[in-house]
């Protein structure tokens, strides 16, 4: 049976400033935590990325032509405040006004993120999410944006806070590349929730006629077997990556079970509990009651089994299938059951995980009025065919199959009562990846990075049909 999406369900593509704009040294842009980190690695450069800084109109025209109603963008904090605070860079401000005007011209509603993995370098150097000064400057940057860009009606405070907190201090794949510091991870998680809450409360106090939400990376953890030990490992993994954020941002308080699981992880690693104050918890509670929507970024699921050895993370950054390792002392070891399909980067293809996460939010966090799927997609190794013309359409049947399965899971969740209002595919066009460079392509539109020419993929045509008909083809 063909699956239907609601008539008011919106579809679009997602981007992030650092991954698409390029122009990292143009028009007074300040440095961010990635610049030094990537230069020292010498593996790949964020310039020119997809050169969106100069080619945004071309990409927005493609989005419009292929049936999109919405688009996810982010503002690069260091284009507005090169140092994170203090002097404003007017050229950066002017760029975003032009970008948002182009969205209006192309009939695209922008959902704009304030922080998408790109802390200004000075604030990263003093502790990033562990620094109170950073948290204060973040709120002031948000205030500036709310006042400066009244044309934006859909704001997102932070993109995937869990990806930053865990990968900065536990797995070490994001700068400052520390490993095993669960105490720093949980303190960063709490501090992110506090900063988010203060920004939501600020936005609502300003009486602006728009919506504000947050975007979480939510990959569903399952037990590897039906043993109680494996179930507990899945619960601990859930506490590390999901539970604190869901409780804090969507319920306004940390559940006793969440805190007990976190204390267990920290005790196993002989690390102290994170600190929080009554004032912070009051702000968190107030914000949860005012939040307009939550964004769910879901790509894959995880399976956990009990593990009591040393922590070890091996990141598969080049698509060498089967090379990733993830085992954390005090939590568990990731191991996929037989028969689970994966990408070359070892990400499982398991749409049931999307359904279960959407239903979990619907059932366990009734305060939040709306859900958007703010990222979902598949990274593939893709190249241009030999005889390419400007009209070449690139076949990507694996992506179409993936999108069909995951959109069907979204439709099932809506049918079961979840108020999912829209879907953003990651990504609009091929982009620069933080830890994979240019080899992992997610776009609906192929970017030939040496020439910056765009080519349509068949998935763009497929999604256009879904957008126009609100029917997922069989």
UniProtKB/Swiss-Prot annotation:
InterPro entries tied to this protein: 6P-beta-galactosidase (IPR005928), Glyco_hydro_1 (IPR001360), Glyco_hydro_1_AS (IPR018120), Glycoside_hydrolase_SF (IPR017853)
Keywords: Glycosidase, Hydrolase
EC category name: hydrolase
Catalytic activity of the protein: a 6-phospho-beta-D-galactoside + H2O = D-galactose 6-phosphate + an alcohol
Pfam family name, one: Glyco_hydro_1
Gene Ontology cellular-component annotations: cytosol
MF (Gene Ontology): 6-phospho-beta-galactosidase activity; beta-glucosidase activity
EC code: 3.2.1.85
Gene Ontology BP terms: lactose catabolic process via tagatose-6-phosphate
Pathway: Carbohydrate metabolism; lactose degradation; D-galactose 6-phosphate and beta-D-glucose from lactose 6-phosphate: step 1/1
Residues the record marks as active site: 160 (proton donor), 375 (nucleophile)
Binding-site residues for D-galactose 6-phosphate, renumbered to this chain: 19, 116, 159-160, 297, 433-434, 440, 442
Keyword Hydrolase part of the UniProt annotation: yes
SUPFAM superfamilies: (Trans)glycosidases
HAMAP family registered for this protein in UniProt: LacG
Protein family: Belongs to the glycosyl hydrolase 1 family.
Protein name: 6-phospho-beta-galactosidase
Organism: Lacticaseibacillus rhamnosus
Source taxonomy: Bacteria, Bacillati, Bacillota, Bacilli, Lactobacillales
